[in-house]
Each structure stands twice: as C-alpha cells, then as structure tokens.
Curated annotation (Swiss-Prot):
Matches recorded under Gene3D superfamilies: Cysteine proteinases
Name recorded for this polypeptide: Ubiquitin carboxyl-terminal hydrolase 21
Lineage of producing organism: Eukaryota, Viridiplantae, Streptophyta, Embryophyta, Tracheophyta
Source species of the chain: Arabidopsis thaliana (Mouse-ear cress)
Function (record text): Recognizes and hydrolyzes the peptide bond at the C-terminal Gly of ubiquitin. Involved in the processing of poly-ubiquitin precursors as well as that of ubiquitinated proteins.
Cited Pfam families: UCH (PF00443)
Positions with biased composition (Polar residues): 11-31, 38-53
C-alpha cells in the first residue's frame, strides 16, 4: 500500500527517475508492455493540468531526503526524453510522466512518493490543484446576486386599467366583452347613479345582471395589476341564452347582445314605482348604447316616401368586398332596390321600392360588429381580410335629415374585440382598451400588457367600441375613483364577490341585488352573519380627509353622501336570521358614533323573555355573601353564609347509585312505571298478528334497544341469551 507524506525540502534532480532500492521495472518481463500502457492511459485521462509544489525548495538546493526517491518534473528536459531509454544503471528503470499532461508552474516544483509495496502514481489533494479556463470571459463573469426575499409580497403597482380576468374554461368571449364594459366611462357613471327597485325585474332571484356587473367593475378597478375570476358569469351562462353551453366557445357578439338585453330588463320596472321618472330615463342600456336608424322606403311608381324609426343597440356591417370601416358604412347606408313587388299604400299597386338606412339617433357609445362569419346554411366560413378602422370617426355623411345638429357626430375609438381562429366556435378572443389618447393595453385573459398604436391598428377587429367626442377618457375617471377607493377600503375579499359563498348570501335574502352590509369601516363580517339592509361602504374622499371617523360613519349612513356605486333604493330588513343572533351593545362604550338608536336592553330578571343575549349584563344581582355583609353594615340581622358543597356538582358512583335506588323505590311505591322510550314506540300493536311478527323480528337482534322494544311489546320480558347459547347456535 502506498503511503503519502509531505515532501521535505530537497534539491532538484535532473535524472527524472523514480528510483526504488528494492523494486525495478523489468522490460523483459511479459507484463512490462501492459504496465507501460496502463501508466500512459492513467496519465492521459488525468484532468490535472498544473501541480503546485507542496513546499518550496531551499535556496541552496540542499535536501534532507535522499534524491533517489524523488520524482522531479521539468518540461524543458522531459520534452526530449524517450520512455524507452534506460539510465546508466541497468537495475534502475525510469518512469517518465507525459509532459503534455503534467506541466509544473516553475522549476522548483517537485513531488515525493514513498512506496513500500509497489509503484503508485500520486494524485495531489484538490486544494493544491489550480484550474485555468480557456475562456477568459467566463472568468470575468460576476457571480449571481442572491434573491432579496422579504416577509411581504412585493407591491404590484396599478397598471392604470382594470384587472385581468382568469380563463376558467372557454370564457375568453365573456372576458373580452366584460373588459370593454369595464372601461366604458358612460356605463360606469350610469351604474354609479342608477336607482333600481328591490327585487329587480331580471327574472332570476339567484342572479342579477345589474348587481353582478356593478360588483365586477368595482372589483376590477380596485384590483388593477392583479387577476380576478368571472365564474359567476360562467355559471349563469344559460341565463343569458338557452343556446349557450358552459365550457363551450360561444360567439362574443351574441353574448354582447344577450347581456345588454338582460341588463335592460333589470333596468325596466313594470310597476313604475317611481312615477315621476319615465321608464326611458331609467334604462341605462338605452342611455349608453341605444341608437336608432331611419328606414326610408320610396315607391318607384308614385315617388311616395315612408319613414320608419328602428331602435338598435349596435350595428352589424357587411365586410365582403370592402377593406375599410368607412366603405362598410357606405355599403350599409346605400340605396337598395327591393324586387319583391311590394304593394304601395299610395298608388295601391305592386311596385318596386327603394330602401335606404340612415343614422337618426347616435348613442354616447356606438358599437359596430364586423360580420366576419358567413353562413350558407350548411357551413360557416370566416373572412380573414384586414379591415382598416380609424381612431377618429365622423358619421355626419350617414345621418338622416331629422338628426339634431347640436349632437356631435364625431367619435373616438376606445376599445375593440378581436377573434383569432378559423371558426366562431373555435379560436380565442382578446380585447384592446385605449385608456388615454396614446395609451393602449391588450387584455388576453389574465395577462395585461402595454401595446403600441401601430400594432393595434394591424389587429383583426371583430367588435368596435366608439365613444362620442367629449367623453372623458378612462384614465381620468380611474384617477377619480382611485382616490375614492383609497379613502374607502374594500369590505369584502376579491374572491368572495364572485364565488358561490357570495351567491348563497344573495339567495338567503330572496333578493338578487342584496349583499352583506356593514356600518363600521375596516370591519370584515362573515358571510354567516345576519342579513342587514345594505349599507353602502363608499363615501366621498373629501369627507374622509377633513372629518374624523365618526363623521365618516355618519356620512355612510346618509343617502346624500357621494358613493362610487351608490344604492339609493329603500330596502326593508329581511327576516333571514333568527333574533337570537342579534346583540345589543352598551352605547356608552362604543368608540364610533351610531347611525341608528339601539333598543333599550331589558332588565336581567326578564332575561328569559328578551329576544337576544346581552353583551353586557346590567342590573345584575349581587352575590349572597355581599348581600349578607351589606345587611350587617346597615344593622339588619346578620345571615350566616354557607358555602355550597362543591361535591354536589360532581357526584361519585355511590351517590349516583343511591339516588337511582331512591327514585326507583319511589316509583314502585306509587305503582307507576316510567316508560323506557317514547310512547308512540311503546304503544302495543292493535293486531296481535302484527305484534307477534314484531316480537319475532326484534328477538333476532341482540342489541339493548331491541330487547327494550321487545319488552315493551310483550307482557313477559325476553331473556338475554347466554354467550354459550350464542356459540352453540353459530356452530349449528
């Protein structure tokens, strides 16, 4: 076995020999070539390129160890040495390491091997090995900086637009339409100031489109920079249309029309409880998206003209053989001949008529649907042609003569929906929103990215949203709402707004537009709390900055306070929870001002008759010991206070058995038998046939309850089988 030791200082030798006094390598032996081959292979496979000296040699070149046991490496001399050459002494053979594999740093490097058994190639420890990389750039690379983790999640700055919407299974067509609604400023203003009855006229007690849209827009604006779920709309997809199927791709324009139809139904009140306001003023859908067309029919025989007004919530444009939105509008409003030989009301003859459509009423928000899908009754194909759409659109050339000249006809593009795919039922929908004149964002499900205007104009638009000139940009509206949101924190978690727990709260109140109300800021109430009349959780930012907390609560209670999404309808408290869950709090200890006067708690003596448990006991009787002391102080007869026996509450086994025997003895003396169970079970069967059948059935079971039932039904109690009988019956 080879032994390694640190080399002592020694002189360098130029013999390059591994000298051993007792062992030599005999070239004449049959194993000599194999030994040379193994030695060369080991040296060639070694990854060592440089070896540092374990200890430097002395300056004078002397060494305390014999030179015949030292292997010195010199690249200048090893380069000319042949391994086949032998030394001057035939008994001393030389083993030379290949210079291409081992090269010393200096001429003073040496390595000493002390061997007692056989020859061994020495591999120095790794701490004395230096590696040089051929690539200098790797040596200049800086080490990776460690991650700086904190105890809190990094703060995500708002993006200036609404939150992204998670795709929970083919919901991209819902998300794209909701993103356009979220960034429609006239719709946001209408939802904030709209008053609707309770319950609404949506036709569904479990789901209200109006309330769901208000909650979604509010949550999306509060969660800017994050992502939220839209499962509430997905789960109620069949409510919008019976043709829709959950987890299936549907057409975005069809969903848009169905959504506006259901939203308009929530706005209309058939009873017209607010008699001073007309139903047209209550319809926020018509106020935001409602437009109208003037259809003109001209008789080619007598030139008589008839005009018809056609209301609409958007317009669908044919895009075949056109490449711009302007040409599609020209094709939409051009004169069309009807060859159906219609009967003229004036000349009473079947004639050919000409029809022309013109815009008569322009809404604050105009939507244009580009018909990219054509259906021939068998197959549906998509038109992939790029349609150019302008950022600014003037509709004055397409207006009717009855149009009000004071109403502006200029519009600005602020959002649109695109479809990527070959069919309407396949592919993917995404939306683009223009929050400022030069700021565009792409909403691809939960991913929200900033995008350039040039890239926006090159996208294949499917539904275009134009806002009338003079409408505030979304960025300014978002800054105003952001100030209000910072002053009024959200009182419910983002997940609970759209999940099933929130829907269960709506179901409990039997009103689709109710939610859990709170009256104190920064207090989170559980979903299982009593359903109170909805208190609005928002107030104006001015009052929150200048008034104290009590004034903020008063502002919340007042209906005149400014709120982002105000509830102004009068609602009565539903009886959705028992009165035992209510509690009265002492008014003197409340830190905030109350908006309503609580009921006066009843005395403690009448506690059995009150409706709810008291949080603070009032008029409580003093203890008997204190009462006895007061009597002695006032000169009355001093009563001796006897401490109650604590063992009475925890009786032992003997006391329990004694009480049981006394009770049993009293019952026997009174000749009364206490029933072992309910009387309806213990009643005997009227028919003895059924009685015997019941006894035979009960005797099968070997449970205490079965034996009690059998004893009650029969005059003679049945005896319990012994264990031996049970074993015998089993063997049989």
């Amino acid at each position: 076995m080879a032994e390694f030791s640190d080399p002592p200082p020694s002189n360098l030798s130029s013999s390059h020999k591994l000298t051993k006094p007792n062992q030599t390598l005999d070239e004449s032996s049959p194993t000599a070539p194999i030994r040379d081959l193994v030695t060369n292979s080991l040296s060639l496979s070694s990854p060592i390129r440089q070896i540092q000296a374990l200890s430097p040699a002395k300056p004078d070149g002397s060494s305390s160890s014999p030179p015949d046991k030292t292997l010195n490496f010199n690249p200048e001399e090893n380069r000319d040495v042949n391994p086949d050459e032998s030394s001057s002494s035939p008994s001393d053979k030389t083993l030379i390491a290949p210079p291409a594999q081992i090269s010393p740093v200096s001429n003073n490097n040496h390595l000493r091997i002390t061997n007692t058994s056989d020859s061994y190639l020495y591999r120095p420890p790794r701490r004395y090995i230096e590696y040089e990389s051929d690539d200098d750039e790797l040596n200049k690379m800086e080490p990776t900086k460690p991650l700086q983790l904190s105890w809190w999640y990094p703060r995500i700055e708002p993006t200036g637009v609404g939150a992204g919407l998670y795709n929970s299974g083919n919901t991209c067509f819902i998300a794209s339409v909701l993103q356009c609604f979220t960034h429609t400023v006239p719709l946001i203003d209408s939802l904030r100031s709209f008053m609707y009855g309770n319950p609404c006229n949506c036709g569904n007690e479990k789901f209200c489109v109006m309330q769901a849209l208000r909650d979604h827009i509010e949550l999306a604006l509060r969660s800017s920079g994050y992502g939220i779920n839209i499962d509430r709309f997905r789960d109620n997809l069949t409510y919008f249309s019976s043709d829709f199927m959950i987890n299936h791709q549907e057409d975005a324009h069809e969903f848009l029309q169905s959504f506006l139809d259901k939203l308009e139904r929530c706005c209309l009140d058939p009873k017209n409880q607010l008699g001073s306001v007309s139903s047209q003023d209550l319809n926020i859908v018509d106020n935001v998206f409602g437009g109208g067309l003037m259809s003109t029919l001209c008789c080619c025989n007598c030139n008589s003209v008839s005009n018809t007004f056609e209301p609409s919530l958007g317009w669908s444009l044919e895009i075949e053989d056109v490449n711009t939105l302007w040409k599609a509008l020209e094709s939409f409003t051009c004169v069309e001949k009807l060859e159906d030989q219609l009967t003229c009301d004036n000349c009473k003859e079947k004639v050919t008529k000409e029809k022309q459509l013109r815009f008569d009423k322009l809404p604050p928000v105009a939507t244009f649907h580009l018909k990219r899908f054509t259906n021939d009754g068998v197959t549906m194909e998509k038109i992939f042609d790029h349609i150019e759409f302008p950022l600014e659109l003037d509709l004055s050339p397409f207006m009717s003569s009855n149009h009000d000249p004071e109403v502006s006809t200029r519009y600005h593009l602020y959002a649109f929906v695109e479809h990527i795919g070959i069919r309407a039922t396949f592919g993917h929908y995404s939306s683009y929103v223009r929050s400022a004149p030069e700021t565009w964002h792409n909403f691809d499900d939960s991913k929200v990215t900033r995008i350039s205007e040039e890239r926006v104009l090159s996208r294949p638009a499917y539904i275009l949203f134009y806002a009338r000139e003079g409408t505030p940009w979304f960025s300014s509206t978002f800054e105003q709402l952001k100030t209000v949101f910072e002053a009024t924190p959200l009182h419910f978690s983002p997940v609970s707004v759209l999940d099933n727990s929130y829907e269960s709260v709506d179901n409990s109140s039997k009103a689709c537009n109710d939610s859990v109300g709170v009256s104190i800021p920064d207090v989170k109430w559980p979903d299982s709390c009593c359903q109170e009349p909805k208190e609005e959780v928002f107030h104006s930012a001015e009052s929150s900055n200048n008034e104290d907390s009590s004034a903020m609560i008063d502002a919340l209670g007042s209906p005149q306070s400014e709120k982002p999404f105000a509830e102004t309808s009068q609602q009565t408290e539903p009886e959705s929870c028992p009165t035992e869950n209510k509690a009265y709090i002492d008014k003197s200890e409340k830190p905030f001002a109350e908006t309503s006067q609580p009921k006066e708690p009843k005395p403690f003596a009448d506690r059995a008759s009150i409706d709810a448990p008291l949080l603070k006991v009032q008029n409580q009787d003093i203890s008997p010991k204190r009462k006895a002391g007061e009597r002695a102080t006032l000169g009355g007869p001093k009563l001796k206070y006897q401490k109650p026996n604590s063992h009475q509450k925890r009786q032992g086994t003997f006391q329990i058995q004694r009480a049981h025997l006394q009770t049993k003895k009293q019952e026997e003396s009174r000749k009364t038998k206490r029933p072992l169970f309910r009387s309806n079970v213990a009643a005997s069967a009227p028919d003895p046939k059924y009685k015997n059948h019941a006894l035979s059935y009960l005797n099968r079971a070997q449970t205490p309850r079965a034996r009690k039932l059998a004893n009650a039904l029969s005059d003679s109690p049945t005896k319990k089988k012994k264990s031996s009988n049970m074993r015998r019956s089993i063997k049989l």
